[in-house]
Amino acid sequence: MDAKEFREFGKAAIDYIADYLENIRDDDVLPNVEPGYLLDLLPTEMPEEPEAWKDVLGDISRVIKPGLTHWQSPHMHAYYPTSTSYPSIVGEMLASGFGVIGFSWICSPACTELEVVVMDWLAKFLKLPAHFQHASDGPGGGVIQGSASEAVLVAVLAAREQAVANYRESHPELSESEVRGRLVAYSSDQSNSCIEKAGVLAAMPIRLLPAGEDFVLRGDTLRGAIEEDVAAGRIPVICVATLGTTGTCAYDDIESLSAVCEEFKVWLHVDAAYAGGAFALEECSDLRKGLDRVDSLNFNLHKFMLVNFDCSAMWLRDANKVVDSFNVDRIYLKHKHEGQSQIPDFRHWQIPLGRRFRALKVWITFRTLGAEGLRNHVRKHIELAKQFEQLVLKDSRFELVAPRALGLVCFRPKGDNEITTQLLQRLMDRKKIYMVKAEHAGRQFLRFVVCGMDTKASDIDFAWQEIESQLTDLQAEQSLVARKSGNVGDLAQHFQIHLSTENATHEKSQ
């Protein structure tokens, strides 16, 4: 393919993407395919001769699009947002065109230095403590990782190496393997699965401590676990707290956790993958309490900041602790400017050697949308979630499981877990909206998240109509079956309602 063909192909692809995103509201959010569908549509070997790009682009519609779950759809309400925007897409395209691998400053000075700039911009935008900025006098700074999973793993591994070095210094009689065998880390039982996985990869057990009834992990619980482990001869290493848990968007008590971590010299990392975007809002300033005392934190720009996946920001109070742990160098990687404070070699801040030019799409997105545009986007998601919350509260057949938090509403139909399961399955079968379940203390519930970059109030109404109408149909079907079998009493207990009274209440609300 020459430059002329590339221009034609590229322009056609941009038109395709624009049409896709403009019309995405009209498509079912979930695909109507079965496992293995793609294997039946594609040959078993690559083509021997080049094919025309028009044929390839045509197969995007014929083969690929039918198998897509539409994450950018306004009807996507599962997980948390995985956002994008037109400026970010352009930035991704430019970065791919430049094709640089920025593992050191000399490999592409703009790649390294732009990352320094945008990470300081972002730290100021989110109102983070100044010591997390590269421009500060201290050893702190920010780096772009691929995902929250990578950021958490970096923190866990760095904390592990620091703990081993410090403990061996004060206990020289112990071998390195003996020390490593005693290490232990902590998190909440509400934390993301990536935290437990980080413990597996670090060969270090992570104790998942019980959160309170409000889903929050507090310092007293951590203190009890640390004291128990110290008494048993174990070595506490790191606590990974969460601001915005996956299940309910709960916020761990960073202030009380930081006090305990400081007392026992335990690294405190904060996973704010979702909720970090709200740091920028003055009305959400409580979320920032205690961040001046943490050692590291991460936030996914690909959730709230309209930057496409992958792009996860990580800040370190003392980057030297990571660099010292990860620095494996070779002569071919060195350059004469190494060691200058304002031009870090980010290969020492991450797991892989190579790194993408992610800062470019961040810079372009920030410049074209502006700080106020980003804040407005976060506020819009919050307001739309409030709209959905009110719809839940107005229908007495449903109940909230946790307070609404940012763009997440956790709710369930009243009754046992089977009702929640059946309702979700009906919604999944229809493919009009997409939600997932979560569970706490044996109670299953539905998570409704505002995700799309262009979600509107009408989309919230559409989703609610789907949900309440499917529950109405489910109740009617089960009522008919129960009356035929004479088990109306069992059904009422199943739903925790009296059918005739509840149906009358629902009809009145209409």
From Swiss-Prot:
Modified residues annotated as N6-(pyridoxal phosphate)lysine in this record: 303
Pfam hit, one: Pyridoxal_deC
First-tier enzyme category under EC: lyase
Gene this protein is translated from: amd
One GO molecular-function entry: structural constituent of cuticle
Protein name: 3,4-dihydroxyphenylacetaldehyde synthase
InterPro entries: Aromatic_deC, PyrdxlP-dep_de-COase, PyrdxlP-dep_Trfase, PyrdxlP-dep_Trfase_major, PyrdxlP-dep_Trfase_small, Pyridoxal-P_BS
Species assigned in the record: Drosophila melanogaster
Biological process according to GO: amino acid metabolic process; carboxylic acid metabolic process; catecholamine metabolic process; chitin-based cuticle development; cuticle development
Record: active site: 192
Keyword flag Kinase: no
Cofactor or coenzyme needed: pyridoxal 5'-phosphate
Task performed by this protein: Involved in cuticle development. Probably responsible for the protein cross-linking during the development of flexible cuticles.
Chemical reaction(s) catalysed: L-dopa + O2 + H2O + H(+) = 3,4-dihydroxyphenylacetaldehyde + H2O2 + NH4(+) + CO2
EC annotation from Swiss-Prot or TrEMBL: 4.1.1.107
Keywords linked to the UniProt accession: Catecholamine metabolism, Cuticle, Lyase, Pyridoxal phosphate
This protein's GO CC annotations: cytoplasm
PROSITE patterns, A to Z: DDC_GAD_HDC_YDC
Keyword Aminoacyl-tRNA synthetase: no
